[in-house]
């Protein structure tokens, strides 16, 4: 089967933004103008096509990245048909992982800003993630019809706060209630969209006389930015003072793809103005899969290899998202980098080293699907029937093995206990948590050995709220949720020698176990080290292992406050036994008793997780942020210059002091600072705090 759309006419783009910039509305309008949805879905009606989980429609925020394929020929049908694969990404800080994995597989992005609130903390986070993956992008300043909207002010913030080089390709005509349309600075014409047909048709008009001077000034900036693309263009510009429309567009495209400039457009998605021009700009200025560098990976001999966006190269693709679908089970979203694969073909998961077979392949339109027979280089689609694939795995041609760069996922930091409300919920909860953990690499599930409770951990409180909510809605599991907890641990700092004796002798068969242990710290990270130093058979061989088991059980149950003990070395060096009364059980209990007594004599301490915290803040708020970290027992480890005059503070802070930090940081810096945190190490809890925890649990 031949390719329907040549790869040069593909655009794989993400639409990213801060929570309320109007990103989902923008995507809805794109689907409307490209003919995919006949009735526009409004977010505030809870009907937006891209927000397809119930939680998203209720909360009015986007949680998962829905992927959609659409086609566009231009506002004036001036292009051949282009295929645009769009990924709508969430804007909330707890879901940054979703944004990260989308950016990893995109070729370009449209970053949406609100014309009133401009650059917000999450937009800074998204921008830094796009920088990390080198994603070329353009900007759409939305909500120009809102009170206080100011396009050029937002362009200024993009320059100063994000350290970017924005080049406006439009100016707004009027703002707030007076917002009428835009001036196209390349054509030097005004564009007015027809409100009667929801902006499906438009007219070019002369630029309003009172705006001509401003338009000419920004037009000059635009042409200068284009001229800087090459020496030839610069010479032509200096001689003629002008460049042709074709030259301007080619130069701006090249500089956008090289990440040297960011083109800026404006409009109001809600009022159906400007989105059509953004689609044209996506086609004219953002890269096709062949415009971006070939993806790098390693082959089965550990040599580095490249895969180009070419149907004739061996098949290679990256699984960037797993979703559970009520009708077909598991959907694996993949981005194809090279080659072709048909439904029914065998592929190789090079990360897991397993063969998989592609069952059906579907192209997603939000959560509706069309079945297709094959996917080719540059495609984004979902496969049904893959058995053991997780986010970040490479799927490739079994005869040409490659592992593409894996995505890195942060360690979860916050933990809550969940308990099923009934016996029926118990079984369903296990299945539900397993499926949710497969979908989301930043979410983990474990069982607390002492209490038997199920603990779930994730990136933040909203993250875990949504998980609990999805268990109820999608899997019908009712559960009670505990308060967020810190995972403390225990260890020892000193040495001791102790005797453990368990004797029960009162007529008939008794119990007799007797051991001497030497207890001391092990190397960090070693866990439990057991040394058998028994000589001359004072304890028979069959009773040695039970002693180790008894010690290990006591370690899991803790000695101070019931938290597991880490990094201890126990040497069994003496003891005695009884011919009749000794048993495995008796020695297990003796070992456990000796360890508890010995650990309490060996300077036991409580450990807490320290988090590596990185805060990006404008200089004005630096003193407040550092003062607050000191109050939270934080240790400042250093400071760096960030982009656009921001400061980056590196610190280590106990997790117990970080609950509610996102809210506190927002209010302390008027929402200008952002932070990330990940687990660093376990460290001793200060005595006064440890005593309180031990008193509570002991």
From Swiss-Prot:
CDD domains attached to this UniProt entry: EF-G (cd01886), EFG_III (cd16262), EFG_mtEFG1_IV (cd01434), EFG_mtEFG_C (cd03713), EFG_mtEFG_II (cd04088)
UniProt superkingdom = Bacteria
A single GO BP term for this record reads: ribosome disassembly
Which residues are listed as membrane-spanning? none
What InterPro entries does the entry give? EFG_II, EFG_III, EFG_III/V, EFG_IV, EFG_V, EFG_V-like, EFTu-like_2, G_TR_CS
Citing just one GO molecular function, the answer is: GTPase activity
- Binding annotation for GTP: 17-24, 88-92, 142-145
Query: Which UniProt keywords are listed?
Result: Cytoplasm, Elongation factor, GTP-binding, Nucleotide-binding, Protein biosynthesis
* Cross-referenced Gene3D superfamilies: 3.30.230.10, 3.30.70.240, Elongation Factor G (Translational Gtpase), domain 3 (3.30.70.870), P-loop containing nucleotide triphosphate hydrolases (3.40.50.300), Translation factors (2.40.30.10)
Keyword Acyltransferase attributed = no
Q: What is its main location?
A: cytoplasm
Pfam families of this UniProt entry?
Answer: EFG_C, EFG_III, EFG_IV, GTP_EFTU, GTP_EFTU_D2
The record's subcellular location field reads: Cytoplasm
Tell me the ranges covered by the tr-type G domain, including all copies.
8-290
GO cellular component annotations of the record: cytosol
Biological function: Catalyzes the GTP-dependent ribosomal translocation step during translation elongation. During this step, the ribosome changes from the pre-translocational (PRE) to the post-translocational (POST) state as the newly formed A-site-bound peptidyl-tRNA and P-site-bound deacylated tRNA move to the P and E sites, respectively. Catalyzes the coordinated movement of the two tRNA molecules, the mRNA and conformational changes in the ribosome.
So what family is this one in?
Belongs to the TRAFAC class translation factor GTPase superfamily. Classic translation factor GTPase family. EF-G/EF-2 subfamily.
Q: Which PANTHER family match?
A: RIBOSOME-RELEASING FACTOR 2, MITOCHONDRIAL, TRANSLATION ELONGATION FACTOR G-RELATED
Q: What is this protein called?
A: Elongation factor G 1
């Amino acid at each position: 089967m031949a390719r329907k759309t040549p790869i040069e006419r593909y655009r794989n783009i993400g639409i990213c933004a801060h929570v309320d910039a109007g990103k989902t509305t923008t995507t809805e309008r794109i689907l409307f103008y490209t003919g995919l949805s006949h009735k526009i879905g409004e977010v505030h009606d809870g009907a937006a096509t891209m927000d397809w989980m119930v939680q998203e429609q209720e909360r009015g925020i986007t949680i998962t990245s829905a992927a959609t394929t659409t086609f566009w020929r231009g506002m004036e049908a001036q292009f051949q048909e282009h295929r645009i694969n769009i990924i709508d990404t969430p804007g909330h800080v707890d879901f940054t992982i979703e944004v990260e994995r989308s950016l990893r597989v995109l070729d370009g992005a449209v970053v949406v800003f609100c014309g009133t609130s401009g650059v917000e903390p999450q937009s800074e986070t998204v921008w830094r993630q796009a920088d990390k993956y080198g994603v070329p992008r353009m900007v759409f300043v939305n909500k120009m019809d809102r009170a206080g909207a100011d396009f050029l002010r937002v362009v200024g913030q993009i320059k100063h706060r994000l350290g970017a080089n924005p080049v406006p390709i439009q100016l707004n005509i009027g703002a707030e209630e007076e917002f009428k349309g835009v001036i196209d600075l390349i054509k030097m014409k005004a564009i007015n969209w027809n409100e009667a047909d929801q902006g499906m048709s438009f007219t070019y008009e002369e630029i309003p006389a009172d705006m001509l001077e401003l338009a000419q000034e920004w037009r000059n900036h635009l042409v200068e930015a284009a001229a800087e693309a090459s020496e030839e263009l610069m010479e032509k510009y200096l001689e003629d003072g002008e460049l042709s429309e074709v030259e301007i567009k080619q130069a701006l495209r090249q500089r956008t793809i090289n990440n040297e400039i960011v083109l800026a457009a404006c409009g109001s998605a809600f009022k159906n103005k400007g989105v059509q021009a953004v689609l044209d700009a996506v086609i004219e200025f953002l890269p096709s899969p062949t415009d971006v560098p070939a993806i790098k990976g390693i082959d089965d001999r550990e040599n580095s290899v490249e895969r180009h966006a070419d149907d004739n190269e061996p098949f290679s693709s990256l699984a960037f998202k797993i979703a559970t679908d009520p009708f077909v089970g598991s959907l694996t979203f993949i981005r194809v980098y090279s080659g072709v694969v048909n439904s029914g073909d065998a592929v190789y998961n090079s990360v897991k080293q397993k063969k998989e077979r592609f069952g059906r392949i579907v192209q997603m339109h939000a959560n509706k699907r069309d079945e297709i027979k094959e996917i080719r280089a540059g495609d984004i689609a979902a496969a049904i029937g893959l058995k053991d694939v997780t986010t970040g795995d490479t799927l490739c041609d079994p005869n040409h093995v490659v592992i593409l760069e894996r995505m890195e996922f942060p360690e979860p930091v916050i933990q809550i206990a969940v308990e099923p409300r009934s016996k029926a919920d118990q079984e369903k909860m296990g299945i539900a948590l397993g499926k949710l953990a497969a979908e989301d690499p930043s979410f983990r599930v474990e069982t607390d050995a002492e209490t038997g409770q199920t603990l779930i951990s994730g990136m933040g409180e909203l993250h875990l709220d949504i998980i609990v909510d999805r268990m109820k809605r999608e899997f019908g599991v009712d559960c009670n949720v505990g308060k967020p907890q810190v995972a403390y641990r225990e260890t020892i700092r000193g040495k001791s020698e102790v005797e453990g004796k368990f004797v029960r002798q009162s007529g008939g068969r008794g119990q007799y176990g007797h051991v001497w242990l030497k207890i001391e710290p092990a190397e960090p990270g070693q866990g439990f080290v057991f040394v058998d130093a028994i000589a001359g058979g004072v304890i028979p061989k069959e009773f040695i292992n039970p002693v180790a088991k008894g010690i290990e059980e006591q370690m899991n149950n803790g000695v101070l406050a019931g938290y597991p003990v880490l990094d201890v070395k126990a040497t069994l060096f003496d003891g005695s036994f009884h011919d009749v009364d000794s048993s495995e059980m008796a020695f297990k209990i003796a070992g456990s008793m000796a360890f508890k007594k010995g650990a309490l004599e060996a300077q036991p301490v409580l450990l807490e997780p320290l988090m590596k915290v990185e805060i990006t803040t404008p200089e004005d708020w630096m003193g407040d942020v550092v003062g607050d970290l000191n109050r939270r027992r934080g240790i400042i480890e250093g400071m760096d210059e960030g982009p656009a005059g921001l400061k980056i503070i590196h610190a280590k802070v106990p997790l117990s002091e970080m609950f509610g930090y996102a809210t506190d940081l927002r209010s302390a810096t008027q929402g200008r600072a952002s932070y990330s945190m990940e687990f660093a190490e376990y460290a001793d809890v200060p005595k006064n705090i440890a005593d309180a925890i031990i008193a509570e649990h002991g």
